[in-house]
Amino acid sequence: MSDYKKTLHLPDTKFPMKANLTQREPEMLKFWEGIDAYAAMAQASGQKGQYVLHDGPPYANGHIHLGTALNKILKDMVVKSRNMQGYAARYVPGWDCHGLPIEHKVEQELGEKKKELPAHVVRKRCRQYAEKYLDIQRKEFKRLGVLGAWDKPYMTMDPAYESATARELGNFVAAGNVVRSKKPIYWCCSCQTALAEAEVEYYDHTSPSIFVRFPLRDPKVADVLNVDPASAWIVIWTTTPWTLPDNMAVAVHPDHDYAVVRHDGAHYVLAAALVESSAKTFGWENCEVVSTVPGAKLEGLVATHPFYDRPSPVVLADYVVLDSGTGCVHTAPGHGREDYETGLRYGLEILSPLNDEGRFLDSVPFFAGLTVFEANPKVIEKLREVGNLLAERKISHSYPHCWRCKKPVIFRATTQWFIAMEKNDLRARALSAIRNDVRWIPAWGEERIHNMIEFRPDWCISRQRTWGVPIIALLCEGCGEAWNDAAWMRDIADRFAKHPTGCDYWYETPLEGIVPAGLACPHCGGNHWKKETDILDVWFDSGTSFSAVLEQRGDTAFPADLYLEGSDQHRGWFHSSLLASMGTRGVPPYRAVLTHGYVVDGEGRKMSKSIGNVIAPQEIIDKYGAEILRLWVASVDYREDIRISDEILSRLVDAYRRIRNTCRYLLGNIDDLTPEEIVPFSVMDPLDRYALDIVTDAHARIQEAYSEFEFHKVFHTLHNLCVTDLSAFYLDVLKDRLYASAKDSPERRSAQTALLHILLVLVRDMAPVLSFTAEEVFRHIPEALRPAAATVFALRGSDTPLYNVSSDESERWEAVLAVRSEVTKAIEPLRKAGTVGHSLDTHVTLYADHKLADLLRATGTDLRAVFIVSKLNIAPLEDAPQDAFASDEVKGLRIGVAKAPGAKCERCWIYHEELGADPGYPGACARCTTVLRTSGAE
């Protein structure tokens, strides 16, 4: 016989070597949709109880980006892995549909017509816009291979959801936490609405930095400072000159020392610790500190406004610091949180004479009609004109900007609705829950959100917009006071649920259908009312999702086991959800919170259109396939910022190819195995038993990593298993047994049985990450061998049995592997010298001490095959020749390597001293001859 290759049992499978992910993935999506893979996965799980991951709703505006893709893939990995571990882990995707970005887009489309249209018409356009992008994003998320209840998502604009949101506001009212008052809040002049803390982002901004003197003409100055009031001044520093028209006081710290500094015949009061730096700023070369007094003694002195004829008293405040400025703080209660609190303590007027565009009203001398930022240079000019400007500089500092339009915001006192943080100990209870009731992943998230809530102001929940859930309240036309009642609010909320477009009911229903019969204002007795036009903060919308979703749907539960979002949500959804739940339920809405970082480019830079480094998910999908995007998510420690580049993706393509090829090899070598020929673990070849032990250990590490959300460990363990443990060792050793042994021989069936078990464990472990490929592999397992599951995600633990060897057996194999590594080293010099080309060309003698020799012999397997050599002997260590390879890693071992004697079998390539004993099979060894004769090969 001349062509022995045809007699080998080479791998045979229809599973393609080339992935062609971009073409095959859409086909797989159709398959999943056809069998309802999500339902099949759900039906197969639940034995261990329920596990709830609650989806933080992305905004229904625009296409998805890499950050949202990362987030959805992470959630998908959690849901799939938990289901495959036996939990009923459902995924209900959600969308945040209300708010400013959508309303802005609609305003741009409507132009000037928007002002003429009733609110419900504008809201209809907003709803249509949200629906459009919700459908777009749903398709894009499904393209990532994410399974979920896509046909039954939750939407914040759904009538039932809007009703639940309004009902939660009623619950807060019933608890007494909702107040309406005039306070300084973040205000965007461009968007013309109040902003919450979570809607403010900080960017570098250049502002004017000015030092201003206030006349201190109070007669009491003579007694307190021992100087003539006619020559006395108090000096402030500010970076917001536009707030000076609304100055009502100057604040000093009661415990700081304040100096009286004489310069050019005048006396200036400022913090003693800042005299030197201030004098340098002012250009004072000759000045003298004539006295110092504690700040507490300055309280009650009355300064005069620098350009208006009105008093500006000196007040005390603990927040005054000495790290910059003068230690004397310009106080405008209408434009700062701390200023406001000080104003309340001292009964100061809360001035904020601005319209919604940030323009000064006609009542403001010198600056009427100017925007606040237009007013800055005019205020400085006025100060210079009256002689009260001591110094002017520019300063670059971190300044609040609107999250939507990215423009600088201001603090402005307006009448708003708030959730009071101190009422019913809301703040204290939230802080306690953070410390005691929630697991934060990473752990630093606990401190971050704790600090945010510990120092946050009352929650401003009102917005001066149209597209959102209206604040259910009535305003008295007589006195302007508001009225609402929890029971009435709940009744209105119930009507929202029954209305086809939810809270459009508030806008479409005439006033008489809203106002309770005979309602009189409790403040003035009036009976003329109008509806509140403010809407709820969208963070209140999404923050009450625990009520609208977790408590309402049968496939979820309250509280959730996990909230998983980007780290910016410590001040966003995690934050608002916690306050909303603690305020009305008394418990947090989640048991654990996991955060991921931001996606950055390969150099660690934030993605920016101006830099030109933005990568869209669709670009990656079109080039590599969604599977590579999923592998990228799993390959990184997502808790930090995550880098992505073509180089990174190319490396992952190589890693993916190695995993795929391993699966293909496994499939190719079980093609002729039948269920009846599966070998029990107890009688399998010892090497096969050990291989299953390796895979079982890897499986345990992978499942632990899934449980701890350490997906990068899943990837690395999976990759190492395929590349190192399987391809480089076990599968390499098996080739002779699989290819050259008799087709139905016990040793070959043992190997095939091991490969089947390994393959089933492999597809189960890789499915949450490499979902497309795992399903493809699963579908290519011969039907008779494939577990009866509709989809790979429906595999149960019983479908993938796990096996371990004894600790003694494991110890023996660890010794074998250590020796195998040393044998490879010992052969290398001969390979380099050209004496041998392959390890099968060698005869190896292991000179081992008694302990090692006994361990090696006790394996009960053919070590020659394990080391992939043609001949192997074990000899006493003391017989080792002088030139034997001495191992540094394995004690009691030396290795002799020589060219294998005899000739190479033309079929199995193993050297034998006798070949061709059967004339019908010249060049074949005895083993191969027997196989050929038995099989009838000619």
Swiss-Prot record:
Positions of Zn(2+) binding: C905, C908, C925, C928
Main localization, broad class: cytoplasm
Keyword Ribonucleoprotein tagged: no
Record-listed L-isoleucyl-5'-AMP binding positions: E565
Keyword Nucleotide-binding: yes
HAMAP family noted in UniProt: Ile_tRNA_synth_type1 (MF_02002)
Protein's name in the database: Isoleucine--tRNA ligase
UniProt lineage: Bacteria, Pseudomonadati, Thermodesulfobacteriota, Desulfovibrionia, Desulfovibrionales
